[in-house]
Amino acid sequence: MNKNVKPNNPMKVITGPDTRWSYANVWEPKSINGGTPKYSVSLIIPKSDTKTLTKIQAAIEAAYKEGEAKLKGNGKSVPPLTAIKTPLRDGDTERPDDPAYAGCYFVNANATSAPGIVDVDRNPILTRSEVYSGVYGRASITFYAFNSSGNRGIACGLNNLQKVRDGEPLGGKASAEADFATDEDDDFLD
């Protein structure tokens, strides 16, 4: 048996290379509202990447089927998939004022353990400045059902990341390289 062949997990997806990373908290876990600190990234997927979007839809459906008992909870029946929270969201309707999300869907993925981060040649990336909100890359993500404090749905876990290429940094902050790209001395006292 080939050791490199892994059993197929229908809830796991590897996104396409045109996926853009936003809100990339992949080096240090962050706590939201006093919750468990987590590593996270918003994965912006072009609507034209139908291959990735089809895989995500199938993985969400697989997570729904696998998690029916959890989703049912104390109720008598499982709520329909259309009635629960799912992680694939439309950037045009949910983030209409953010041009980075225009013409895209997005998925927020998180994990309590750090994701592995590699470059296009699968070498580990250790320099933090190489991974920022705005880069393009593939993401290994897994979908799962949850039922917590009355909230039921499908969530997305973050496994690993592969940076494919640089992109315009998101967040409106210029890089130090861009700020100091000119040799001119702009003396504000002149």
Where are these regions (language model features)?
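Compact mixed alphabeta submodule
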Residues: 118, 122-190
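Structured, beta-strand-rich domain cores
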Residues: 69-150
